[in-house]
Amino acid sequence: MRDWRFIFEKYLLRKHPPLEPQVWTELSRIRGGLFVDVGAYLGTYSVRLSPHFRHVYAFEPNPSAVPLLRKRIEERSRRNITVFPIALSDSNGLARFYLDAHQGFNGSADTLLQVFKYNPGRQIGAGPAHTYVGKECVMVPIATYDSQIQEAADLVKIDVEGAEFQVLKGASGALDEGRIRRIMVELHDKDAKDDLYKILSRYGFKLKQLDPHPRIFGSLA
């Protein structure tokens, strides 16, 4: 995706910080059998939380990031992490995956969406909402959550650069059956917050804001 403003803000001005102390405080209390990391990227969440779970499923479709993710897992001897080099979405098959043009950052802003609105809220120093239009893309395998995971998950984290609702649609079976105990979603458009709350409240989740920007919402109790 050719959006140098996003790259400049995220990595140089730190306006889009990937980690939040408040989030880690919440997550560090959780223990369980399975953590599903949707949009694992280089494995920050997967690796850091892996000691708290028997199994971690890390979903990452970026063909440049996957080898680095596997290397990081190997270097830290995290044998309970399984990497799935596919994108979770609302269907099964192949799809265009639009690339972050700044290869030096290994595509942290890659997305299944060709048009991606970034409007996360009151981030410190952030300018007005802006939209990215994908130019370069690769074909990647996609699948629904329901087609990939049958067991119950103690925690599901979703960070997929605007494609959050496609992932949730593809997980409707697991949500219906109560096979997702806790969920955390990084929402990239604050105008969609009410939709997120509405969808997840149907399944009994009581979401709360987990960071001060706001962009991360979850039900972690």
Report residues per predicted region.
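Phosphate/nucleotide-binding beta-alpha loop and adjacent structural elements of enzyme active sites
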Residues: 1-221
